């Protein structure tokens, strides 16, 4: 006879920003919950865990913007431009877990190999590598967007050097310092820029191999806007947000002016051309043929579309280090590796190397779900419902074109369809990027997907997603009809495809649009999204997490009011029945 499963009310998979906050929020709102947090790392933090960080790794967000609203981050190891180091972030998340009692609920070095439905359809069974399965009534799948590294496979004959992913760069610091003189870096994501900078600072020779796809290289902002203030501070203002055409912000004066009027669209175009010019001027791509290969596409406004990705040069001397460093860019792909230390390229060249570092990004971390369950959960496009979703997508395209004419004729040639197909065929079809419409419409509140978005302002997004999601899982809020939820998901996906081109075809991507997303979740919760004390601050002063530090108490107040109204209604009905 098989032993009974170890069962929990809630299991959270992932101990990064999203998983820790989801667990804390659940325990705050339902303190008696039997909750477990699982993570396959040796320490908390996810991509910011102790084993994954290295000295030159910094977040792309300035210090006061990269923290939970109610738990200030120490001002330690901050870059000259105000960016937070990986070491500081890891210590912060570890302290957060300890101070909020989450360590007692945590199991590290625990890999979930398979997730499936139990005999009871609202129960989830988790198969654990090298251990007994676990069961739970509610599952919070908070593995995030950076948990499943993409590692290409090539023909290999006699190659003996390490081949690692950028995720493992922290573990290989001693090896690189003592054994590496020449390195091959593969990819054009932000992590490739970080890896190249780190290697050049260590005096290594770098061969940077990046496929010459249509989406082009990563768009890298200067650390400051016009040399006056931190770029992350600038894009966290409502004023800057108004220049980005966004499906989550389609009303109000700024929308009607900047996105609907001819003059407003001219000013919007001028804003983005200026931003692109400042970015290009800071990078000085024209200095060499080598650096010209890193110029974002389209050349005139690459930082607006961000088809290859969008980020910030967090090291003040990044471009000077690059221009002076011993680095060669190869616009091709690796064909094979051989002869102990040789990397063979498709353009016919061969390169000797002491290590290969993949900076090839991340696939969607849904390998634990079988294909049928992935379709049921909206994690992949269901071919059975292809015609229905095609109609929804076509209507969504029309909606986006009507509401946001600035991106109506987006340059679709800047994309790599092969890359899109390899990453789950596009963004999830989830309502508010969190909930499966089909399950929610059936009253199934047993699974939530926080963190599967690409937004630079991670801590605040984690906090709002947690409060929104946990309150729904507890049955405290109802959602719209299935049709409305599916339309919302289709509209968002159509928008992000048009707005961010290749990135939007692969991910729920909204780097410039975090304020409208936060506003949307706040309104859903019945909370006031406008947090500043006056109109000037509301539009021109940066929004930071501490502006939201009272949202949990605010939501509790809303919840108390709702319960009082429910009781009042029940008493009225009871009185009417007595009168009858």
UniProtKB/Swiss-Prot annotation:
Gene3D superfamilies: FAD/NAD(P)-binding domain. This is FAD-dependent monooxygenase DEP4. FAD binds at residues 47-50, 112, 473. It comes from Fusarium langsethiae. Keywords: FAD, Flavoprotein, Monooxygenase, NADP, Oxidoreductase. Belongs to the FAD-binding monooxygenase family. It comes from the Eukaryota. Disulfide bonds: none annotated. Its cofactor is FAD.
């Amino acid at each position: 006879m098989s032993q009974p499963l170890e069962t929990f009310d809630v299991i959270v998979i992932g101990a990064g920003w999203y998983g820790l906050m989801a667990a804390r929020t659940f325990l705050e709102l339902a303190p008696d919950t039997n909750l477990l947090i699982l993570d396959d790392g040796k320490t908390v933090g996810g991509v910011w865990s102790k084993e994954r960080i290295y000295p030159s790794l910094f977040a792309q967000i300035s210090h006061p913007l990269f923290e939970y609203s109610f738990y200030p981050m120490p001002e330690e190891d901050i870059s000259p431009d105000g960016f937070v180091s990986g070491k500081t972030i890891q210590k912060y998340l570890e302290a957060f877990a300890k101070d909020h009692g989450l360590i007692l609920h945590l199991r590290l070095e625990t890999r979930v190999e398979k997730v499936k439905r139990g005999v009871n359809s609202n129960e989830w069974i988790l198969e654990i590598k090298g251990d007994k399965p676990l069961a739970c009534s509610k599952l919070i799948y908070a593995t995030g967007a950076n948990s499943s590294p993409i590692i290409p496979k090539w023909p290999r004959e006699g190659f003996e050097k390490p081949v690692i992913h950028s995720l493992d760069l922290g573990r290989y610091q001693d090896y690189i310092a003592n054994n590496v003189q020449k390195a091959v870096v593969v990819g054009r994501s932000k992590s490739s820029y970080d890896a190249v900078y780190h290697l050049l600072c260590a005096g290594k020779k770098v061969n940077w191999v990046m496929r010459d796809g249509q989406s082009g290289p990563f768009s890298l902002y200067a650390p400051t806007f016009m040399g006056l203030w931190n770029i992350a501070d600038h894009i966290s203002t409502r004023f800057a947000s108004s220049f980005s055409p966004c499906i989550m912000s389609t009303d109000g004066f700024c929308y009607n002016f900047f996105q609907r009027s001819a003059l407003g669209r001219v000013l919007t175009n001028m804003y983005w051309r200026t931003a692109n010019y400042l970015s290009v001027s800071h990078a000085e791509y024209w200095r060499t043929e080598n650096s010209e290969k890193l110029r974002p596409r389209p050349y005139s406004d690459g930082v607006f579309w961000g088809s290859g990705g969008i980020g910030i040069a967090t090291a003040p001397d990044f471009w000077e280090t690059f221009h002076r460093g011993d680095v060669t860019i190869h616009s091709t792909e690796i064909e094979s590796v051989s002869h102990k230390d040789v990397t063979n390229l498709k353009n016919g060249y061969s390169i000797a190397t002491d290590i290969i570092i993949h900076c090839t990004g991340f696939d969607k971390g849904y390998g634990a779900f079988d294909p049928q369950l992935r379709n049921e959960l909206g994690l992949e496009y269901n071919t059975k419902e292809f015609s229905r979703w095609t109609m929804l997508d076509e209507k969504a395209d029309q909606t986006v074109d009507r509401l946001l004419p600035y991106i109506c004729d987006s340059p679709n040639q800047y994309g790599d369809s092969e890359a899109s197909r390899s990453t789950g065929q596009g963004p999830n079809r989830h309502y508010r990027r969190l909930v499966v419409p089909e399950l929610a419409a059936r009253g199934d509140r047993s699974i939530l997907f926080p963190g599967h978005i690409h937004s630079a302002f991670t801590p605040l997004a984690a906090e709002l997603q947690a409060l929104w999601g946990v309150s729904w899982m507890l049955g405290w809020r109802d959602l719209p009809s299935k049709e409305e939820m599916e339309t919302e998901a289709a509209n968002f996906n159509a928008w992000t495809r048009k707005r961010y081109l290749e990135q939007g075809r692969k991910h729920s991507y909204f780097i410039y649009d975090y304020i409208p997303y936060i506003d949307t979740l706040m309104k859903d919760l019945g909370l006031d999204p406008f947090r500043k004390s006056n109109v000037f601050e509301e539009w021109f002063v940066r929004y930071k997490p501490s502006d939201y530090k009272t949202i949990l108490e605010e939501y509790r107040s809303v919840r108390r009011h709702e319960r009082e109204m429910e009781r009042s209604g029940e008493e009225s009905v009871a009185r009417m029945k007595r009168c009858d």
